[in-house]
A protein has these predicted regions:
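Short beta-strand element of the alpha/beta-hydrolase
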Residues: 57-66
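A glycine/proline-hinged amphipathic helix-loop "lid/cap" segment
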Residues: 1-54, 285-292
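Short strand-loop-helix active-site module centered on a catalytic nucleophile
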Residues: 46-48, 61, 83, 104-166, ...
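Serine-hydrolase catalytic core
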Residues: 200-255
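Catalytic active-site module of serine/aspartate enzymes centered on a nucleophile-bearing elbow/loop
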Residues: 265-292
């Protein structure tokens, strides 16, 4: 699955074809057993992933990655099914609108709508844990800033290799350009143009690095040491700490962008997901279902 995103970013390819290929690649996902996948039509559509055992009243609202131009609940079934099994929690994945058909801030608007939908189902703000990867990580952090400003603070947030700065100003873009195994800088900049289409790159709804945070909840970030987006994690962590937040930045050597997608193929993916489940347990006083 990771190779499809890499191919799209590395070489000229129609975004719609790349999106289709990414969806098709999900057939290779090693989905954790006993996964229940239900869908609900709406704006946006919501996908509910769970195992047969769970913790009532607790939920993860997860925003998939894919550079805002591809991805879905289906493409992320491997890591999300494993997280559902490790935590025992239901994971809700919105099908937020994608660029270039729906440029920024469409995804942010859908993220807010997904959160409203969970509140309408009876969840309290403190029962909602935000999770995400890559571009979805930026989206989740942008939503968290908005929720904190409106006193709807979530329990916490975890993010895998988050993309937090659409101004592309991090020094690791230059420093790690030759060693990042997944993301070429040039194609990332082209993707920025597809997503923004004139929208300000430093707007907090697309770049949470520039958002004000009012007493943010605990945050857990995992990122590869060789990623060009490494500084997106480091700088985001500092912004949150400056706002009084508690942040763990878990850096992994030798792991590509969102290596969690390779659960079932490489041991580092499972280990990272187990660590994430342990973080989730600290938020909700749960006992993680280790190594399932």
């Amino acid at each position: 699955m990771l190779h499809v995103t890499r191919q799209w970013l590395a070489a000229p390819k129609d975004v719609f074809r790349a999106r289709k290929d990414f969806e098709s690649s999900s057939r290779f996902a090693r989905v954790a057993p006993y996964l229940l996948h239900l869908s609900e039509r709406g704006t946006p559509d919501l996908h509910y992933l769970s195992v047969r055992r769970g913790n009532a009243g607790k939920v993860v609202l997860y925003f998939h990655g894919g550079a805002y131009v591809m991805g879905s609940a289906r493409t992320h079934l491997a890591p999300l099914s494993r997280l559902a099994r490790l935590t025992g929690l239901q994971i809700v994945v919105p099908d937020y609108r994608l660029a270039p058909e729906h440029p920024a801030p469409a995804a942010f608007q859908d993220a807010v709508a997904a959160h409203v939908a969970l509140l309408a189902k009876g969840y309290q703000p403190q029962d909602i844990i935000l999770g995400a990867d890559s571009a979805g990580g930026g989206l989740a952090l942008a939503l968290m800033a908005d929720l904190c400003a409106r006193n709807l603070r979530p329990a916490g947030l975890f993010a895998f290799s988050p993309w937090t700065d659409f101004a592309m100003s991090g020094d690791s873009l230059r420093r790690n350009a030759a060693i990042d195994p997944a993301l070429p800088v040039g194609r990332m900049r082209e993707t920025v143009d597809l997503v923004l289409q004139g929208f300000p790159p430093q707007d907090p709804r697309i770049s949470p690095l520039y958002a004000p945070f009012n007493a943010p909840p605990p945050v857990f970030v995992q990122v590869g040491a060789e990623e060009i987006l490494l500084d997106d994690s480091f700088r985001m962590a500092q912004v949150l700490r400056d706002a009084g937040g508690q942040v763990t930045c878990d850096v992994w050597n030798g792991c590509p962008h969102v290596w969690h997608m390779l659960d079932g193929y490489i041991p580092e993916a499972r280990a990272a997901l187990v660590a994430t489940a342990a973080f989730v347990a600290t938020l909700q006083a749960l006992v993680p279902i280790a190594n399932r």
